[in-house]
């Protein structure tokens, strides 16, 4: 693939995740049932994700998505946003970072580890932004300061326990609030851009 031409903005690595008010992305026993995903919010997800250049996932996130989305639009009870996203997911190029996954379908490439030089090359290619949707993979990207933007969908709930979105770290990273958008169900998008010296 061709690198981005001079004067063309390099595409970004964007971390997208729903999070509770007290900082959890997952409840006890991997519970995600507390997340409010209205048709309005799902439509918003679809509009933005359709512009992406690729989805970047770890093995667990990829296998979760691959177990549902390839045929989700065949369910007669599926809402219009669900039907739309099934097509987006199938068609979107996907990169799975995994040391153990041997095969992956649905327009998916397997990469064994996060190598900063390879990520820089990926960002320099033309196309839409690259979207990370899993916390473990995001941690590997944070370790190399590779994430350019966060899209946090803050859910109006206190979970009390579960898996925290951000693990303890000795590194301080600063961000600029680029957008705040409330939705009717009480979810708020907070979009932050990484500030680099």
Residue ranges: model-predicted function:
Residues 1-197:
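Enzymes that bind and transform nitrogen-containing heteroaromatic metabolites
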């Amino acid at each position: 693939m061709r690198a981005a031409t001079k004067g063309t903005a390099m595409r970004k690595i964007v971390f997208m995740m729903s999070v509770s008010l007290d900082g959890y992305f997952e409840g006890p026993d991997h519970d995600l049932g507390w997340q409010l995903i209205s048709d309005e919010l799902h439509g918003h997800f679809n509009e933005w994700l359709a512009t992406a250049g690729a989805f970047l996932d770890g093995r667990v996130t990829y296998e979760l998505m691959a177990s549902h989305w390839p045929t989700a639009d065949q369910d007669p009870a599926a809402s219009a946003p669900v039907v739309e996203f099934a097509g987006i997911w199938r068609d979107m190029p996907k990169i799975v970072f995994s040391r153990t996954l041997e095969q992956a379908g649905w327009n998916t490439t397997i990469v064994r580890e996060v190598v900063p030089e390879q990520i820089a090359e990926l960002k320099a290619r033309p196309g839409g932004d690259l979207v990370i949707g899993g916390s473990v993979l995001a941690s590997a990207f944070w370790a190399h300061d590779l994430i350019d933007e966060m899209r946090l969908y803050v859910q109006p709930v206190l979970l009390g326990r579960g898996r925290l979105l951000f693990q303890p770290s000795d590194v301080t990273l600063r961000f600029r609030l680029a957008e705040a958008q409330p939705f009717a169900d009480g979810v708020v998008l907070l979009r932050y851009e990484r500030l680099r010296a």
